[in-house]
C-alpha cells in the first residue's frame, strides 16, 4: 500500500460532518462506541456532533446538537449507560418530526448519521434516509432551506451500530451491551448459589431479553442451571412432570441447590406465558422445596461495561466512521456487525427483516424456524445446553471407550468449566472418563482417577485449576506415561492448557515413533491468560484476565484523575505475547502499550513522553501506559518509569504498578465459561469419532497427523488443526504464533490516544449479505 493511500484516511473526512446518537434502551459499551466515532471522525478531519437524548434531540435541535471535541469524550470509556442520553421518541415516528430533524441536520451541514441502538432505532434511521430527498424538497418549498443547502446535503449516509443487552438482532454474533449484561447476571447467580447451597433452596431467576432467549440460554450454560425457559423453544406439553423429575433427580445425586432460569418472554407451546412465579408455585406444590424467585430487572442494564463490550464498541465505532465516509448515494444503509472476531458490514434492512422474521415465526408457532433464524451461534448454545442439562448420564455400555482429561501449564480461569463439559459429554456418550492431576506429571506418577457426573458438579464458575496444572513436559517420562496409559486403558486424551499443552502435544506426536502406547488420539483446548497458543484466535482464560486488568486500570485512572498530572506505568502478563497489553490498552483507554511484537526504540519512548507532556496542557491531566512483561529485556518497567519520571519533571509525576498473578485468578467471566463449555463439548464429539476411526484389530492405533489436533477459533469457526501443521506457524523461542490477528487493532489504539499515524484502510470490512454470512457464521 502506498503512502498516499495510507495518508488518505487522514483527509477522508475533510469538509464532512458526522452526527452520533444513542437511541432506545441503553446498553453498556455505548460510550465506547460514541468515543470511537468522535475521535476517529476528528482524526479523519471531519466535524463530529453529539445528538443528546436520541431522536428527540434530533427533532428538537438547538442545544441538543453540539459539536464534540477530543477531550469531551475523555473518561467515558468505563461508564455504563450512555453519556449523551437516550429517549424513546414519538415525534420521530411522525413525518412532521422527521422534517424538523432533517432541517436541523441540513442547517449544520451534517450528512452522515451514526445511530447506536436496537432494531427499532435502526429501522427509524432507514426510513429517515429513504425519505431524505422528499424531506429536503418540502423544506425548500417551505423556504426553510436554500437551494444551495439542499444541494450540499443532497444525500444522507446512515450506519447503524447495534446497542442492546438482549442480543436480539440478526446478523451479528454479539450486540454492544450483551456481554456486560451477562456479567451482571453471572455475578448475581454466583452470589445466589452460595445462599442456595447453605439452605438447600431452589431459585427461579428471571432475566431480561424481551422476545429473545439469548441471555437466559447463555446464563444457564455458564452457571450449569437445571432448566431454562426461552421463547424460541417452548418446552413440551408435559414439561411440568419433566421439570419436577429433573429437580428431584439432581437432589438425589447430592446437589444442595436447583437453579431455574426464566427468560422474561418465555411461553409454552400454546403461546401462554411461563412466569417465574408460576414456576415457583409448581415446584412448591409438587415437590415442597424451599423456593425463591429473583427478578433481576434493570440491574442487567447497569454497571461498568466489560472489556469485551469496550473493545467491541471501539472497533464498531471505527468501522462505522469508515463506512460513513466511504459511502456514496448508492450504498445502502448498513449495520456494522461482529462475525466471530471480525467486523463485517451488512445491509441494515436485510438484518431488520430477518429480525422481524424471527418474531413472526414465533407468533406463528414455527419455533424450529425461529431457532434457525437466530443463527448458528444461538443453535450451538442450545445444542450444548440440551446435551449437558437434559440427559441422565447412561451407565457405561459395552464397547465404550476411556478418555482422560488433564490441565497443563499455568492456571487460567475457565479450565474447570472445560473439564466439566469434557467429563459430562464423555459420560453422556456412554464412555469412561478419567481425570489426571498435575499436568503431565499425573500420567507419569499414576495420579489418575475416574470421574463421575457429580465429580465436576458446580465447577463452571470456579477459577484456577481444580485438577492441578503443571508446566512439566512429557518427554522425560514417556516410559512411565506409556505404562500408565496401558494400565488405565486410556484410549484418548484431552489436554486443556497453554503453550505447554501445545508443545506437550508435539512431543507426544514425536514419541509415537518409540512408544506404540502414545498412538492414541489427543486434542488440545487452548487455555491460558496469554492467548499465545498457535491455531486459535482466542484462549480460555484470556477474557477473565483482560477484565481483571481493565478493572485495575479503571481504579488507577481514577486515582490519577484525582491527583492530576500523573502518569501510571502498568506491567501486564502474557510472556512475549502482547495480546493482554494491547487489548487492555484499547479497553482502558491507554496512551501507549509496549509489546514485543512491535519493536520500539528510545526515540519511540521519547515521542510518548512528549505526547504526554502535550496532553497535560489539555483538560485531561493524566496518563496510562501499559507494558507487556517481556516486551524488551533492556527497556524494563523500571527503566521506562525512571525515564518518564526524569523527562516529565515539573510537568507530571509517574507511578508504576506490576499487576502480577492476580491476572491468573478470579471467577471466570461469562465469555470464558461459555467458550470453555463449548470447546469441551466440541472436543469430545471429535474424540468419539476419532477413536472409532482409529480402532483396528481390537485396539486403538492412531498415528496419522490429524489424530493430534489443536481445537481453535479461527475468524468465524471452530476448527481442528493437526499440531504438526502448526509447527511452522510458531515462534518457539518466544512462545508465540508468527501471525496474530489482534495486531491489526494496534492502529486503533494509537488513533484513540491521539497519535498522528497512518491508518491502513485496506483492512476494513466490505459489505456482505446476511444470508451468505449466516452459512459461514461463527460456531461460538
UniProtKB/Swiss-Prot annotation:
UniProt region (Interdomain linker), positions on chain: 391-401
Enzymatic reactions: beta-D-fructose 6-phosphate + ATP = beta-D-fructose 1,6-bisphosphate + ADP + H(+)
InterPro entries in UniProt: 6-Pfructokinase_euk (IPR009161), ATP_PFK (IPR022953), PFK_vert-type (IPR041914), Phosphofructokinase_CS (IPR015912), Phosphofructokinase_dom (IPR000023), PKF_sf (IPR035966)
Pathway(s) of this molecule: Carbohydrate degradation; glycolysis; D-glyceraldehyde 3-phosphate and glycerone phosphate from D-glucose: step 3/4
Source superkingdom: Eukaryota
EC number: 2.7.1.11
Enzyme class at the top of the EC tree: transferase
Cofactor dependency: Mg(2+)
One Pfam family it belongs to: PFK
Gene Ontology CC: 6-phosphofructokinase complex; membrane
Binding site for ATP: 25, 88-89, 118-121
List of glycosylated residues: 530
Keyword field: Acetylation, Allosteric enzyme, ATP-binding, Cytoplasm, Glycolysis, Glycoprotein, Hydroxylation, Kinase, Magnesium, Metal-binding, Nucleotide-binding, Phosphoprotein, Transferase
N-terminal catalytic PFK domain 1: region residues: 2-390
Catalytic machinery residues: 166
Residues at which beta-D-fructose 2,6-bisphosphate binds: 471, 528-532, 566, 573-575, 629, 655, 661-664, 735
Region (C-terminal regulatory PFK domain 2): 402-780
BP GO annotations: canonical glycolysis; fructose 1,6-bisphosphate metabolic process; fructose 6-phosphate metabolic process
Family, similarity comment: Belongs to the phosphofructokinase type A (PFKA) family. ATP-dependent PFK group I subfamily. Eukaryotic two domain clade 'E' sub-subfamily.
This protein's name: ATP-dependent 6-phosphofructokinase, muscle type
Organism: Oryctolagus cuniculus (Rabbit)
Taxonomic path: Eukaryota, Metazoa, Chordata, Craniata, Vertebrata
Gene name as annotated: PFKM
Amino acid at each position: 500500500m502506498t503512502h498516499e493511500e495510507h495518508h488518505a484516511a487522514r483527509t477522508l473526512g475533510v469538509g464532512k460532518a458526522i452526527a452520533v446518537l444513542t437511541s432506545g434502551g441503553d446498553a453498556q459499551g455505548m460510550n465506547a462506541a460514541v468515543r470511537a466515532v468522535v475521535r476517529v471522525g476528528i482524526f479523519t478531519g471531519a466535524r463530529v456532533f453529539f445528538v443528546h437524548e436520541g431522536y428527540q434531540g434530533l427533532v428538537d435541535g438547538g442545544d441538543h446538537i453540539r459539536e464534540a471535541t477530543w477531550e469531551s469524550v475523555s473518561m467515558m470509556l468505563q461508564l455504563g449507560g450512555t453519556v449523551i442520553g437516550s429517549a424513546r421518541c414519538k415525534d420521530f415516528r411522525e413525518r412532521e418530526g422527521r422534517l424538523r430533524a432533517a432541517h436541523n441536520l441540513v442547517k449544520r451541514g451534517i450528512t452522515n448519521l451514526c445511530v447506536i441502538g436496537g432494531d427499532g432505532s435502526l429501522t427509524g434511521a432507514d426510513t429517515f434516509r429513504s425519505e431524505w430527498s422528499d424531506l429536503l424538497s418540502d423544506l425548500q418549498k417551505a423556504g426553510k432551506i436554500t437551494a444551495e443547502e439542499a444541494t450540499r446535503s443532497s444525500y444522507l449516509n446512515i450506519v447503524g451500530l447495534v446497542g442492546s443487552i438482549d442480543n436480539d438482532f440478526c446478523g451479528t454474533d454479539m450486540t454492544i451491551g450483551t456481554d456486560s449484561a451477562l456479567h451482571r447476571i453471572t455475578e448475581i447467580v454466583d452470589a445466589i448459589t452460595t445462599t442456595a447451597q447453605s439452605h438447600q433452596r431452589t431459585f427461579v431467576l428471571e432475566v431480561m431479553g424481551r422476545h429473545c432467549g439469548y441471555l437466559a440460554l447463555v446464563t444457564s450454560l455458564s452457571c450449569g442451571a437445571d432448566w431454562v425457559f426461552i421463547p424460541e423453544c417452548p418446552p413440551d406439553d408435559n414439561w411440568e412432570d419433566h421439570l419436577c423429575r429433573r429437580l428431584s433427580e439432581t437432589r438425589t445425586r447430592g446437589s444442595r441447590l436447583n437453579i431455574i432460569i426464566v427468560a422474561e418472554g418465555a411461553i409454552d407451546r400454546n403461546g401462554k406465558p411461563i412466569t417465574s412465579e408460576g414456576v415457583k408455585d409448581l415446584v412448591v406444590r409438587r415437590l415442597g422445596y424451599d423456593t425463591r424467585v429473583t427478578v433481576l430487572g434493570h440491574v442487567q442494564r447497569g454497571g461498568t461495561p466489560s472489556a469485551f463490550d469496550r473493545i467491541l464498541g471501539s472497533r464498531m465505532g471505527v468501522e462505522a466512521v469508515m463506512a460513513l465516509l466511504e459511502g456514496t448515494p448508492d450504498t445502502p444503509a448498513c449495520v456494522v456487525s461482529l462475525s466471530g472476531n471480525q467486523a463485517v458490514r451488512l445491509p441494515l434492512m436485510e438484518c431488520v427483516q430477518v429480525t422481524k422474521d424471527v418474531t413472526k415465526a414465533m407468533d406463528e408457532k414455527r419455533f424450529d424456524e425461529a431457532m434457525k433464524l437466530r443463527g448458528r451461534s444461538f443453535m450451538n448454545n442450545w445444542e450444548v445446553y440440551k446435551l449437558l442439562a437434559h440427559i441422565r448420564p447412561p451407565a457405561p455400555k459395552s464397547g465404550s471407550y476411556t478418555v482422560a482429561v488433564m490441565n497443563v501449564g499455568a492456571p487460567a480461569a475457565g479450565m474447570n468449566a472445560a473439564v466439566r463439559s469434557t467429563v459430562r459429554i464423555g459420560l453422556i456418550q456412554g464412555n469412561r472418563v478419567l481425570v489426571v492431576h498435575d499436568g503431565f506429571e499425573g500420567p507419569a506418577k499414576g495420579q489418575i482417577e475416574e470421574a463421575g457426573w457429580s465429580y465436576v458438579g458446580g465447577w463452571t464458575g470456579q477459577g484456577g485449576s481444580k485438577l492441578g496444572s503443571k508446566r512439566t513436559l512429557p518427554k522425560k517420562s514417556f516410559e512411565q506415561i506409556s505404562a500408565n496409559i496401558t494400565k488405565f486403558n486410556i484410549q484418548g486424551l484431552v489436554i486443556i492448557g497453554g503453550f505447554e499443552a501445545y508443545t506437550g502435544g508435539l512431543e507426544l506426536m514425536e514419541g509415537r515413533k518409540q512408544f506404540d502406547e502414545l498412538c492414541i488420539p489427543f486434542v488440545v483446548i487452548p487455555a491460558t491468560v496469554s492467548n499465545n497458543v498457535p491455531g486459535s484466535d482466542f484462549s480460555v482464560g484470556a477474557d477473565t484476565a483482560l477484565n481483571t486488568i481493565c478493572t485495575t486500570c479503571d481504579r488507577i485512572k481514577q486515582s490519577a484523575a484525582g491527583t492530576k498530572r500523573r502518569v501510571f506505568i502498568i506491567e501486564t502478563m502474557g510472556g512475549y505475547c502482547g495480546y493482554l497489553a494491547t487489548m487492555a490498552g484499547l479497553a482502558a483507554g491507554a496512551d501507549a502499550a509496549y509489546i514485543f511484537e512491535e519493536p520500539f526504540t528510545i526515540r519511540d519512548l521519547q515521542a510518548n513522553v512528549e505526547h504526554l507532556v502535550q496532553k497535560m496542557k489539555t483538560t485531561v491531566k493524566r496518563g496510562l501506559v501499559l507494558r507487556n512483561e517481556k516486551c524488551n529485556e533492556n527497556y524494563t518497567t523500571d527503566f521506562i518509569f525512571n525515564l518518564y519520571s526524569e523527562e516529565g519533571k515539573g510537568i507530571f509525576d509517574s507511578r508504576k504498578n506490576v499487576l502480577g498473578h492476580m491476572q491468573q485468578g478470579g471467577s471466570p467471566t461469562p465469555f470464558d465459561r461459555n467458550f470453555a463449555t463449548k470447546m469441551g463439548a466440541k472436543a469430545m464429539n471429535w474424540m468419539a469419532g476419532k477413536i472409532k476411526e482409529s480402532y483396528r484389530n481390537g485396539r486403538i492405533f492412531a498415528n496419522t497427523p490429524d489424530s493430534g489436533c489443536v481445537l481453535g477459533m479461527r475468524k468465524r469457526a471452530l476448527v481442528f488443526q493437526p499440531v504438526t501443521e502448526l509447527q511452522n506457524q510458531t515462534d518457539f523461542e518466544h512462545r508465540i504464533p508468527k501471525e496474530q490477528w489482534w495486531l491489526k487493532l494496534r492502529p486503533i489504539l494509537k488513533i484513540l490516544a491521539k497519535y498522528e499515524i497512518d491508518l491502513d484502510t485496506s483492512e476494513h470490512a466490505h459489505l456482505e449479505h446476511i444470508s451468505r454470512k449466516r452459512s459461514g457464521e461463527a460456531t461460538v
